[in-house]
Every structure is written in C-alpha cells, then in structure tokens.
C-alpha cells in the first residue's frame, strides 16, 4: 500500500512482522472497549496474538500500522476472504498459539481466562454471514489519538481497497455495549447483522 499522510505527523503505512511487538502493545492498550486493558491481564501478548498477529502474518496485504512520529498508535486489519483465512489459521496458526498457552502454572485473571476460552474455540464464521459479507476488518487506535478523525480515514481507505480487490461485502465484530463504535460504523452504512448480550456483528455490502 502507499503511505497515507493523515495530518499532524500521523502516517498510515503497511504493517510488517517487525511491527508486531508494537501492534500487540496497541491491542492491549485498546483491549477494554477502546481503553487500556493492561491492568486486566497477566498474559499481555495473548489478546494481540488472537486479534492482531494472525492478520499481519497471514494476510499482510490488508494490514496497516498507524504511526504518530515513530510510535505505533493504531492498526487497521482486513481480510478479503474470511473463510479462506480461517482455513489457513486453523492449520498454520492456532495450533502454535494454543501450544504456547497450554500449560500455565499460575492463576490467570478473569480477562485472561476469557481469552483462553476464545483461543480454544477458534474455528469458522457462520457461512450465512460470510456468504453475504465475505471480508472482515478490525481497527484500533490508542485512546490519546481517538476522536481526531484518523479512524474515519482509515476505514474509508480499507473499504476502497477491499472493493478494488473484488469484495462484495465486509463485516466486523464489536462489543455490544460500545455505542460509540456502533454509531461510527453506521455512518459508513454498516448495519447490525447479529447481536447478543456481549457481541454485535455489523455488515456492509458493496
């Protein structure tokens, strides 16, 4: 991807493997519905190993890092074909991460316990969802840089990239209680597709 200058020294560029430590940090610092979740975890990298690393490693074409100066302050992650991506992860990624966390010899926090459950149930998205919304995306920006318009520019950029690549629709997962995010995505035309007490899946067709 071409670098996108978003103003005030903020840059969106392609993410790479060397960015992973910083991307994992951002994932942790936004892991509590956009707020810092560091205090909730004894396994600081696990949240990012579930929600960020798979994209950078196995779908780098649509993985971007947001930088303020030299510091990574956000990321934008996309997948063109969710089903194909999940096939790859099931074979090449999840077994490695599961093995890493198989034997933990100390008490975990409730948040870490939930992540371990999430890790162990990784599988496939509902076919009715991916049939209509085959692509998906994930974005996070640290709290100090939220509300500056960067997220809007980032999402618009990725939606254009997915459309150009031939996608017919995209979905995303978010906390059902995150009303701010819900309003944000609705401005792009996303609608609620599936929802329960904890999670909302929103979708957009092209």
Locate the predicted segments by residue:
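A short beta-loop-alpha structural element at the N-terminal edge
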Residues: 11-25
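Conserved GNAT-fold acetyl-CoA-binding loop/helix
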Residues: 32-51, 89-98, 102-107
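Active-site rim helix/loop that mediates acceptor-substrate recognition in acyltransferases
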Residues: 41-63, 69
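Conserved beta-strand in the GNAT
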Residues: 65, 71-80
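Conserved catalytic-core motifs of GNAT/GCN5-like acyltransferases
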Residues: 83, 171-173, 186-204
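Conserved acyl-donor/pantetheine-binding loop and adjacent beta-alpha core of acyl/acetyltransferases
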Residues: 83-138
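Conserved GNAT acetyl-CoA-binding A-motif
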Residues: 133-135, 162-175
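Conserved acetyl-CoA-binding loop-helix of GNAT-fold acetyltransferases
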Residues: 138, 147-164, 183-187
